[in-house]
């Protein structure tokens, strides 16, 4: 049942909402002090889900500056997006409106949050939300719902009065074009979802879930009879510049989740992987092909930079992995990303002409 913390005689950040499982026996003042300190964790308060705001009280950030002729391209990377979500928050704070956004995997979540003009959801999705006990764990993986429980993370929490309510009305009102990429398990081919595919919020969220479905860690997602996994297995290895190119763009602001000198290594035991994926052989081949595709895309980005056709944000460091669940580390990654965004802002302005 929902309990408004502001009804209690304990000072906490506002607005804030706590959900307790029915029958939970907790010392409520101690709980509120823990919330105030920011140390509510899965282990300390397992039945708790923090909802940092009510959607009805949230106002979308205005877009005041149009970016002409440049597409925004958002790489995936799971929880590494804690670092790069700061880039989106910074752009929203500046009111920058790109005409086109392409996102894959975690980048698809950033795409939706950016178009809905929601900096708070952008930040929380890859930081504090990881403390939610229903986010996923070994138990949910063994139960067949995935190490990250995709249905809960992407579809359930976006609903009103849930952990991360999504402003679908603002999203629909936007004129920005976008593409979200996923990979078909049948042939390993790339599928691009656009605004025309998303008549309802669940249409959007299930496609973000499909784009973010890590093979082996999350079960495939079926949409209209077609089964999908992570879009990072597609043609460019997870950097969806091809989505923007399909819509005619030749100038890009690319946000990567790996440092500039990163090179993706080949799969060590391809035959073992083929055996593990014997029921979906195209997925195995896409995983095996991904390092070469990814490295080729990074080389293409370097060429585009040299030609003045791309600005690429590379993290100076990457302190978290794609499966990180420690909120303190995720917050630190976000802070590092924001510090880098602030430092690079003058270069952004020069490239974008704003």
Regions found by a protein language model. Give the residues of each.
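Patatin-like phospholipase
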Residues: 52, 56-104, 112-354
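Polybasic, low-complexity intrinsically disordered segments
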Residues: 2-5, 10-54
């Amino acid at each position: 049942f929902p309990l408004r913390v502001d009804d209690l005689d304990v000072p906490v950040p506002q607005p804030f909402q706590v959900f307790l499982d029915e029958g939970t026996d907790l010392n409520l003042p101690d709980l509120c002090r823990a919330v105030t300190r920011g140390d509510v964790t899965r282990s300390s308060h397992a039945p708790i889900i923090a909802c940092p705001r009510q959607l009805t009280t949230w106002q979308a950030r205005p877009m005041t500056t149009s970016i002409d002729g440049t597409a925004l391209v958002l790489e995936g990377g799971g929880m590494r997006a804690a670092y790069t979500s700061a880039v989106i928050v910074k752009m929203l704070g500046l009111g920058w409106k790109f005409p086109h956004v392409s996102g894959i995997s975690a980048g698809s979540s950033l795409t939706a949050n950016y178009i809905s003009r929601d900096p708070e959801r952008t930040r929380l999705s890859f930081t504090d939300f990881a403390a939610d006990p229903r986010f996923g764990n070994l138990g949910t993986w063994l139960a067949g719902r995935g190490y990250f429980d995709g249905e809960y993370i992407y579809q359930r929490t976006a609903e009103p009065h849930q952990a991360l309510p999504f402003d679908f009305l603002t999203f629909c009102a936007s004129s920005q074009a976008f593409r979200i990429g996923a990979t078909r398990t049948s042939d390993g081919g790339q599928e691009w979802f656009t605004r025309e595919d998303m008549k309802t919020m669940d249409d959007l969220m299930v496609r973000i879930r499909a784009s973010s479905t890590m093979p082996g860690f999350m079960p495939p997602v079926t949409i209209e009879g077609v089964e999908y996994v992570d879009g990072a297995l597609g043609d460019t290895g997870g950097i969806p510049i091809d989505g923007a190119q399909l819509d005619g763009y030749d100038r890009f602001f690319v946000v990567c989740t790996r440092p500039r000198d990163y090179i993706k290594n080949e799969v060590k035991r391809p035959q073992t992987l083929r055996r593990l994926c014997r029921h979906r052989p195209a997925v195995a081949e896409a995983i095996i092909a991904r390092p070469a595709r990814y490295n080729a895309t990074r080389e293409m980005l370097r060429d585009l930079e040299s030609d003045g056709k791309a600005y690429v944000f590379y993290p100076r460091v990457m302190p978290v992995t794609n499966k990180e669940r420690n909120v303190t580390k995720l917050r630190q990654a976000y802070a590092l990303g924001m510090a880098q965004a602030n430092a690079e802002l003058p270069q952004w302005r020069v490239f974008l002409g704003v």
